[in-house]
Amino acid sequence: MFVDKTLMITGGTGSFGNAVLSRFLKSNIINDIKEIRIFSRDEKKQEDMRIALNNSKLKFYIGDVRNYQSIDDAMHGVDYVFHAAALKQVPTCEFYPMEAINTNVLGAENVLSAAINNKVTKVIVLSTDKAVYPINAMGLSKALMEKLAIAKARMRSPGETILCVTRYGNVMASRGSVIPLFIHQIKQGKELTITEPSMTRFLMSLVDSVDLVLYAFEHGRQGDIFVQKSPASTIEVLAKALQEIFGSKNAIRFIGTRHGEKHYESLVSSEDMAKADDLGGYYRIPMDGRDLNYAKYFVTGEKKVALLDDYTSHNTKRLNLKEVKELLLTLDYVQKELKNA
């Protein structure tokens, strides 16, 4: 599907960029693809990636999604875009909400507009469960990003740039996530700081995150939102699973929720569940393609939203301690940390 094509990954030196490049380099995709453009603002991370991966098909572009000209210039000749650049730390975005807006909303506007201007074939935009019923600046900015993508998708004619969204749960061991923090605290002999023990989060691996984007890329139609069905765990069980894996008896200290944190996350609202397609391991939420002349769209027999539940980290499959341990041991990051323990 990438034969002789050029792919751009915004925020390409982050966790997702590293994961998708690892997948491509271990498969035949890297042999088929014409070029992969890594677009990001951190020259040190780009240089580290260039040296580590050492592949002539990787091209590096310094720029910022906040700057339209830099993203537009880098997108000339691009066939596909994975838009992963974002500010994603919830407490940080609470203190600097305009920075979240500048990157997650206005930056996304620049990426989408540049893609349309350069006649890119398809764009996959990476979103988050925090965009569903958002209560924090990060989630609000990502919800607006989704709305931007869908609004632009609604205006596209057949044959024009296809815009799709993927919505993630918690990606385990990604940069800034809680698993690296817990492992660091275990290794340093410190207390494990847990915000709220009964708080639940979806558990996705970086492999899952790549699978979701590639699934959306292969199957996505104009304006689709894709969600991967994922299990969940409480934060306390996650911490105890890591303690057992590392043979740790560190004390646990409950510190209370941080700014903007929710008790549980939602990946699909009941409103979206009313129109979602169940694709087995995924939900597809099709775009509402109606215009503002609602009278001509009145129909009967639709699903009743009131009878449907949201898809949340509270009502998905809840993993017990043994199951969480087994899942964590499949992660390359955890295996690497075990070897270095």
From Swiss-Prot:
Its keywords, alphabetically, are: Isomerase, Lipopolysaccharide biosynthesis
Q: Which GO terms describe its biological process?
A: lipopolysaccharide biosynthetic process
**Family from the record:** Belongs to the polysaccharide synthase family.
Q: What is the protein name given in its UniProt record?
A: UDP-glucose 4-epimerase
Q: Which Gene3D superfamilies has this protein been placed in? A: NAD(P)-binding Rossmann-like Domain
The record's listing under Pfam families reads: Polysacc_syn_2C, Polysacc_synt_2
Q: Where in the chain are disulfide-linked cysteines found?
A: none
Reactions catalysed, semicolon-separated, are: UDP-alpha-D-glucose = UDP-alpha-D-galactose
Task: Answer whether the UniProt record assigns the keyword Lipid biosynthesis to this protein.
Answer: no
Its taxonomic path starts at: Bacteria, Pseudomonadati, Pseudomonadota, Alphaproteobacteria, Rickettsiales
Quote the InterPro entries the UniProt record gives: CapD_C, NAD(P)-bd_dom_sf, Polysac_CapD-like, Polysaccharide_Synthase-Rel
- Statement: the UniProt record of this protein carries the keyword Isomerase: yes
Species the sequence originates in: Rickettsia prowazekii (strain Madrid E)
The protein's GO terms of the molecular function aspect are: UDP-glucose 4-epimerase activity
* Protein role: Epimerizes UDP-galactose to UDP-glucose. May contribute to formation of LPS or the exopolysaccharide slime layer by providing UDP-galactose as a substrate for either molecule.
Misc remark: Addition of NAD/NADP does not result in differences in enzymatic activity. Gene transcripts were detected at ten days post-infection in chicken yolk sacs infected with strain Breinl.
User: What general EC class does the enzyme of this chain belong to?
Assistant: isomerase
Enzyme Commission designation: 5.1.3.2
